[in-house]
Amino acid sequence: MKHYQAYLIDLDGTMYKGTDEIDGAAQFIDYLNNNHIPHLYVTNNSTKTPVQVTEKLREMHIDAKPDEVVTSALATADYISEQHPNATVYMIGGHGLKTALTDAGLSIKNDEHVDYVVIGLDEKVTYEKLSIATLAVRNGAKFISTNPDVSIPKERGFLPGNGAITSVVSVSTGIQPEFIGKPEPIIMSKSLDILGLEKSEVAMVGDLYDTDIMSGINVGIDTIHVQTGVSTYEDIQSKEIPPTYSFKDLNVAIAELEK
């Protein structure tokens, strides 16, 4: 296995599974930390702040820091502030998205006359929220969604994800949003910019082919698939572009790196 200078790492299915630890995850991060290898956690979860993400990782005995976390909310806020500083935004989403937008100097408004509509996962979404978003998009607001995931794994099973919520507005208006999170290149490009390395020096680590592995492929970096989450080894063998590597778990990756 190639020794990379840095890694971009998925969370759910790679570092943990729901509220359960994944064997090899904490050990892999310890290996990176002990060898001073930079890494970022890249997540489509827009509901949590980097501090909250770090707290969960630490509960899983993973030694993480907030400045190592790149959420779809952060990538969205940066993208808008670069395009249109001080823009007005109508948002549907959680605390993580609201914090990211306001920290970026964007003004959140509760009406349909805004520069941008941003939709992130909102477990308390209402018809009224969707109505305001729909009217704002019809009025000409730029339409952005933090991530396209149509379902998310929960203890009860697979529940509607942000892509499902976003689809209500896109179907009603006939306008497709610009997606920021994996597998789209915007969140990955931001992560690569933070690392400041050549693409050939960085690998993406994740379990889900359509999201994690494709995010790496879409920006031209190597990919490491771990068989600890959604996509099985058999799943990835049928893909037109397979990942660069596929391991049973991150313990195997460590063993390969230590050869």
UniProtKB/Swiss-Prot annotation:
Cofactor(s) of this protein: Mg(2+)
Keywords assigned: Hydrolase, Magnesium, Metal-binding
Family matches, as CDD domains: HAD_Pase_UmpH-like
Annotated EC: 3.1.3.-
Metal-binding among keywords: yes
Gene Ontology cellular-component terms listed: cytoplasm
InterPro entries in UniProt: HAD-like_sf, HAD-SF_hydro_IIA, HAD-SF_hydro_IIA_hyp1, HAD_sf
Annotated TM spans: none
Enzyme class: hydrolase
Family membership: Belongs to the HAD-like hydrolase superfamily. NagD family.
NCBIfam families in the record: HAD-SF-IIA, HAD-SF-IIA-hyp2
Reported function: Catalyzes the dephosphorylation of 2-6 carbon acid sugars in vitro.
Protein name: Acid sugar phosphatase
Organism: Staphylococcus epidermidis (strain ATCC 12228 / FDA PCI 1200)
